[in-house]
Design a protein with these regions (language model features):
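Binding-site signature for planar aromatic cofactors or substrates
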Residues: 1-218
């Protein structure tokens, strides 16, 4: 493989032009509020999907798995996303609810890591979010056998068309297999790019007395 595919290592000039002096966030005491602020800033600067996050799970053999999904809600209870419970991630979550999340905002040169446990959100909450989706997306949730093998795209489209016909002229309810999960955070870490790889890291750990924070070496 050609080395030209990999970006060259930054030089002195690159670092000098990219240093950030905005470290006011280091004084934050509430990681959820800090996360919300960072996400709000990223929504302005990212090309798209600033709420995209990596969700890491493990299967029955302890083999890790990771994929990118969209964060759909955030408050002091946790981070919420939705998916098909019959998918690989859904099956893995039913086996082990220990989850790790990762956010990376290239435009801000920031990352956030979250570790915690996932629990299924209440049906009324999942129903409300499902109803807010575009009709086509709701139909797709019924038509897709997520993570299962399929012969070709024609097969997929035929099933989608059949599902559209099935719901023609009627509302599209949430399928029983389409669920939401809330990741209750036990650890949240914030990372801000620094010159010469000397980054700033701030970690929050949940204890019986609430959040405890501390700095980490880069």
């Amino acid at each position: 493989m050609s080395k030209s595919i990999i970006p060259s290592t930054p030089n002195e000039k690159d670092y000098a032009s990219s240093q950030s002096s905005d470290l006011g966030w280091i004084d934050s005491k509430d990681p959820v509020s800090l996360f919300s602020n960072w996400l709000s800033e990223a929504i302005v600067t990212e090309i798209n999907d600033a709420n995209a996050m990596s969700v890491a799970t493990v299967d029955k053999n302890g083999m890790p798995d990771v994929r990118v999904v969209l964060l759909k809600d955030i408050d002091h209870r946790g981070f919420v996303f939705y998916s098909n419970s019959e998918s690989n991630k859904g099956q893995q979550l039913s086996f082990s609810n220990k989850v790790a999340l990762g956010f990376h905002w290239k435009s801000k040169k920031r990352q956030v890591r979250v570790r915690g446990t996932a629990e299924v959100v209440a049906s009324i909450e999942a129903d409300a979010y499902f109803a807010s989706r575009a009709r086509g997306s709701r139909i797709s949730a019924w038509a897709s056998h997520q993570s299962r093998p399929v012969k070709d795209r024609e097969t997929m489209m035929n099933e989608l068309n059949e599902t559209e016909a099935r719901f023609e002229g009627t509302s599209v309810p949430r399928p029983n297999h389409w669920l939401g999960w809330r990741v209750k955070p036990e650890y949240i870490e914030f990372w801000q790019d620094g010159a010469y790889r000397f980054h700033d890291r701030l970690a929050f750990s949940m204890t019986s007395d609430g959040w405890v924070k501390g700095r980490l070496y880069p």
